Amino acid sequence: MQVILLENIQKLGNLGDIINVKAGYTRNFLIPKGKAKLATKTNLVEFELIRAKLQIAEAKTLKNAKAIETKMTNTICIIQANASEEGKLFGSINTTDIQTSLIKSGFKIEKRNIDIPETIRHTGEYKININLHTNITVSVKIVIEALQKV
């Protein structure tokens, strides 16, 4: 099924691209979320009329992402979790924990934009990637510390 993308979508395409995707993905995700329209003649004409507005909005989003990238480049997030004496965590650190830590640091990041390359099950330092935009990914240092028992 051919659709016109109304925004940049990672691993799929950029604003204005006409791509082939599966019908279910189109019906259940892209169209209801306003991320795409069916590639009919009327929708193509309509898209050309609103293309300038969408490109301005996309440029603004890119500018905001670059601003966040410069602030976030040297950020170190410290997460405290229950751990054994050897440093093994009771459980693991997931995207929700990292998102909470980033919010405390002053960054509003969605969980789906956080990429953890490996499972975090021990105390120590880790590098994670945060996708701010389709073209902008920033690497953030995460420090996992054992919670101090009183």
Swiss-Prot record:
GO terms for biological process: translation. GO terms for molecular function: rRNA binding; structural constituent of ribosome. It comes from the Bacteria. It holds the Pfam family Ribosomal_L9_N. Binds to the 23S rRNA. NCBIfam families: L9. PANTHER family: 50S RIBOSOMAL PROTEIN L9. Belongs to the bacterial ribosomal protein bL9 family. This is Large ribosomal subunit protein bL9.
